[in-house]
Amino acid sequence: MQRIILIIIGWLAVVLGTLGVVLPVLPTTPFILLAAWCFARSSPRFHAWLLYRSWFGSYLRFWQKHHAMPRGVKPRAILLILLTFAISLWFVQMPWVRIMLLVILACLLFYMWRIPVIDEKQEKH
């Protein structure tokens, strides 16, 4: 029963993480890490799919090995975060929603700032 629950949570996390790529309020990284954790404990097949076949695979393998982001990925991720939040702030009219978005943005940027980076060239040596 626990295995089935972990698989369901894992797939739910994959869906939410994928939606998080385009929706600024949903963070991608924590959901994909949750999916990897769930699949590692419940399904070697789904875990292998996530690590080697999915769009997130190379980033997950890098995170699993180094607990860091590749140097070039971090600025692109931050730029995408800023762009999606700017679009949201442009369309939202309610002040309390704008404030909420700005607070979420600040927390997300702080989280991103704290993630260590490593050069991919340095990693290969």
Curated annotation (Swiss-Prot):
Residues 27-45, 93-95 are periplasmic. InterPro entries: DUF454. Residues 1-6, 64-74, 119-125 are cytoplasmic. Keywords: Cell inner membrane, Cell membrane, Membrane, Transmembrane, Transmembrane helix. It is found in: Cell inner membrane. The keyword Cell inner membrane applies. It is a multi-pass membrane protein. The chain crosses the membrane at residues 7-26, 46-63, 75-92, 96-118. One of its GO terms (cellular component) is plasma membrane. The keyword Transmembrane applies. NCBIfam families: PRK10527.1. This is Inner membrane protein YbaN. It comes from Escherichia coli (strain K12).
